[in-house]
C-alpha cells in the first residue's frame, strides 16, 4: 500500500521530509565493531534517507565490563577505550554545511534485568582532580553503584525511586578531517551529556 506522503505535492517536488519513512534496525550484530573515535575514516554501517527511523542497540559507556559493584573501573577498563559508539550512519543527500535534525523518539533499557551504573573513577570526571583540572580537596575513593532501572523508575534503594529520564550522552556528525575521541565534546557534537537530549527532543 502506498503511503499518502509518496503522492503528495511535496514529494513530487523532491522534498526529503515528504517521503514515507522507513524503519531500520542497527543491532549489535549488524554494528559489529563499535568505535572509540568519531571521524571520516570508518566505513558506514547503515545508509538511510532523510526522515527514516532508526532503532539502535547501544552499549553503555563501560561496554558492559562493569557488571558488579566489585568491578572497579580502574581494574576492568582500559582507558581511553570507553564510551563505544554506533555508526557511522550515512544520510543520503546530506552535504557539508547542511543542518541535520535528529528526533529522539524513545529510549528503552535493554536486557531482562537492566541496571545502570554510577561510579567515582580516579582522574576522571568533574568530581575528581586531573592533570588539567587540579582540585585542592583530596580525591574521593573509587566506588561503583549498580542500580536497577526500567521505564517506571530508577530504583536507588528500597525507599528511593528516581524518575526515569534517559538521555543520549554522545551524538555526533563526522568531523571533516580529524578523528576525535568519543569522550570529547566539540563543534561536531560528541560526548555532550545533555539531559535535554532525551525522548521527544530534536538535536540539530
What are these regions (language model features)?
Residues 48, 91-94, 197:
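Short, well-ordered loop/turn sites that connect or cap secondary structure elements
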Residues 56, 99-102:
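A generic structural signal for residues embedded in beta-strands
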Residues 44, 87-90, 193:
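Short, conserved secondary-structure segments in the cores of folded domains
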Residues 29-39, 79-85, 180-188:
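Short, structured beta-strand/loop micro-motifs enriched in basic residues and often containing a Trp
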Amino acid at each position: 500500500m502506498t503511503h499518502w506522503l509518496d503522492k503528495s505535492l511535496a514529494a513530487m517536488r523532491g522534498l526529503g521530509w515528504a517521503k514515507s519513512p522507513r524503519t531500520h534496525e542497527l543491532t549489535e550484530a549488524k554494528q559489529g565493531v563499535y568505535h572509540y573515535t568519531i571521524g571520516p575514516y570508518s566505513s558506514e554501517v547503515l545508509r538511510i534517507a532523510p526522515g527514516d527511523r532508526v532503532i539502535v542497540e547501544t552499549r553503555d559507556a563501560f561496554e558492559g565490563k562493569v557488571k558488579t559493584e566489585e568491578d572497579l573501573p580502574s581494574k576492568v577498563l582500559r582507558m581511553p577505550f570507553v564510551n563505544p559508539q554506533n555508526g557511522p550512519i550515512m544520510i543520503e543527500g546530506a552535504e557539508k554545511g547542511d543542518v541535520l535534525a535528529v528526533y529522539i523518539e524513545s529510549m528503552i533499557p535493554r536486557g531482562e534485568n537492566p541496571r545502570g551504573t554510577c561510579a567515582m573513577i580516579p582522574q576522571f570526571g568533574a568530581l575528581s582532580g586531573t592533570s588539567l583540572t587540579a582540585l585542592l580537596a583530596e580525591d574521593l575513593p573509587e566506588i561503583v553503584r549498580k542500580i536497577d532501572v526500567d521505564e517506571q523508575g530508577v530504583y536507588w534503594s528500597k525507599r528511593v525511586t528516581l524518575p526515569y529520564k534517559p538521555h543520549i550522552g554522545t551524538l555526533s556528525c563526522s568531523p571533516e578531517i580529524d578523528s576525535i575521541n568519543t569522550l570529547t565534546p566539540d563543534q561536531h557534537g560528541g560526548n555532550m551529556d545533555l539531559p535535554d537530549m532525551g525522548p521527544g527532543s530534536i538535536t540539530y
